[in-house]
């Protein structure tokens, strides 16, 4: 993708790259989603993105769930609760090198989660319990030791737990097909 979303990095490193689109300035969530859709349509093997949970949500919103696109996040946000991030940029580079050499072939679904503010629009204070919400799952390379584990906040919010259980059953109807849920 053009500009600050990839092309500038390749250019500064002296690496040629095919640029299939360009972001607005400054970049936005919409630019991320447009880039993901365009790249996904080319049937890429791996989509690397840089950011935090908000960017992971943008990727999730744009990736075609039926293409099984494999993604890997490079942690660059202020909070990463999702399980789709490498533990470091070096770990991400090792995963990419392994994929290029054919040594890593498995993939696994990992959750995309994000902070849920107690008050809409509020930021996290150091005295506040952090609650997160599950937004879905993305395919990531199965690379034990290279991926961050999903982080879970301390205190459960019963309404969020109920919402997540209901969402899980709605997303996986084969689990209860032909059975009564009480």
What is each residue range found by the language model?
Residues 46, 69-70, 180:
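Proline-centered loop/turn at the N-terminus of a beta-strand
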Residues 67, 174-177:
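Short helix-terminating capping/connector loops at secondary-structure junctions
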Residues 1-44, 93-175:
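ATP/NTP phosphate-donor binding region
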